Amino acid sequence: MQQRRPVRRALLSVSDKAGIIEFAQALSARGVELLSTGGTARLLAEKGLPVTEVSDYTGFPEMMDGRVKTLHPKVHGGILGRRGQDDAIMEQHHIAPIDMVVVNLYPFAETVAREGCSLEDAVENIDIGGPTMVRSAAKNHKDVAIVVKSSDYDAIIKEMDANEGSLTLDTRFDLAIKAFEHTAAYDSMIANYFGSMVPAYHGESKEAAGRFPRTLNLNFIKKQDMRYGENSHQQAAFYIEENVKEASVATAQQVQGKALSYNNIADTDAALECVKEFNEPACVIVKHANPCGVAVSTTILDAYDRAYKTDPTSAFGGIIAFNRELDAETAQAIISRQFVEVIIAPSATEDALKITAAKQNVRVLTCGQWAQRVPGLDFKRVNGGLLVQDRDLGMVSEAELRVVSKRQPTEQELRDALFCWKVAKFVKSNAIVYAKENMTIGIGAGQMSRVYSAKIAGIKAADEGLEVKGSAMASDAFFPFRDGIDAAAAVGVSCVIQPGGSIRDDEVIAAADEHGIAMIFTDMRHFRH
């Protein structure tokens, strides 16, 4: 597929003008005639480039506040005309061939994301002429190059220089695929935006816009192929969203180590999202998507030491996340103590990276600092469908807690309860977390019965020689029976935090009172499956 087509005439019309001046200058320097519209044409003219306004080229002015610019036979005939087949009809109607179209579309996503965006604003940012030109050029990729991404500008100029001003069919075909992906994503955004309004239009909701659209169109960009998926017989790849506004695994920069695996990414996401819950210097160690050690302290070194003590056995080969910059002292403590798959932090000092570089297999990611969590959607694939829900960003404050036991918690118990409640949110259900003095001392995860999660948390603490007496226990959901409270009391738990809501709440509260345990209700559940 090496059939070449020279680029003699290009039409440039972009909303995102990053790099467009330099690209236009490079095209013009290579003898390419430039056509352009509106703001793009004015910008190029201001830079001294010879550019023809599309309205002058067609003999037809822009109208309706710019709604009609390029929807003209001289434009689309020049793009869609098949070289060697439509030449006579093009000549008859004075239609010149357009060999390259450089277009990106009105910023619809950015517009509707702005607070207070009206329906009228959204409508005016639906591009019509742009997608039409993009699709026309992509359809006729045998003769025309369509450029929708500024990241392709340099490569296009290099190829033109290597091919006497021409582009190969391979390149034009690849650009066409990107163009169709671009317009598909654009139409999906518009469909999702208007689809979310359907319930309101039909009187099914009092909200101005329903939370979920009638049809859901998703657009993700492949970031990397994986060696394999969750298991070696499964193929896999990692896709990311565009314009992610929150520090995440998807946007993190890998500064050291071999390529991330499928399981690395899943586990690192779990660790990072957990450590984001804490304002104090914090460390989270994750194994198989479950926290196995969490602590907060005055420094991340001390937080790491305390998190590691929870379960050194499980920490081997784990993922470590911090909410502060990784420093050399902490990096040295990790490298000298354990095997670790991934370390992720907002940033890392040069000295820390020199230390981790001694272990080439250790992957180090920096994700940038975060200010607040960004609402969004969570997805879970089921056979034949997709479950969609809001991200679980819920968290209770001290003022929202309800003490339901006879005994009030002490200040330390209250701090420990709130700490382990944050951790329990990220442990697979049924989740039980024991904590004392801002560190986890036992975690029971993923058991089918809640009482066994409570027992396992106690066993883990005993195995590591950690003192449970006087600790707090968090449960991600209510206790259906009193047995979980009895199990906690047997190992010395003195305070329990849980959502409440069981039909046997009275029995559970009575059990707490019998054991002298302070019990706190959050009225919020944190199932995690």
Swiss-Prot record:
The species this protein was found in: Salmonella paratyphi A (strain AKU_12601)
Pathway per the UniProt entry: Purine metabolism; IMP biosynthesis via de novo pathway; 5-formamido-1-(5-phospho-D-ribosyl)imidazole-4-carboxamide from 5-amino-1-(5-phospho-D-ribosyl)imidazole-4-carboxamide (10-formyl THF route): step 1/1; Purine metabolism; IMP biosynthesis via de novo pathway; IMP from 5-formamido-1-(5-phospho-D-ribosyl)imidazole-4-carboxamide: step 1/1
Matching CDD domains: IMPCH
Give the protein family. Answer: Belongs to the PurH family.
Give the keywords, sorted. Hydrolase, Multifunctional enzyme, Purine biosynthesis, Transferase
Q: What is this protein called?
A: Bifunctional purine biosynthesis protein PurH
Gene giving rise to this polypeptide: purH
The MGS-like domain is annotated at 1-148
- Any GO BP: 'de novo' IMP biosynthetic process
Q: Name one GO molecular function term.
A: IMP cyclohydrolase activity
Q: Name one Pfam family in it.
A: MGS
Comment, domains: The IMP cyclohydrolase activity resides in the N-terminal region.
User: What domain of life does the native source organism fall in?
Assistant: Bacteria
List the InterPro entries hit by this protein, alphabetically.
AICAR_Tfase_dup_dom_sf, Cytidine_deaminase-like, MGS-like_dom, MGS-like_dom_sf, PurH-like
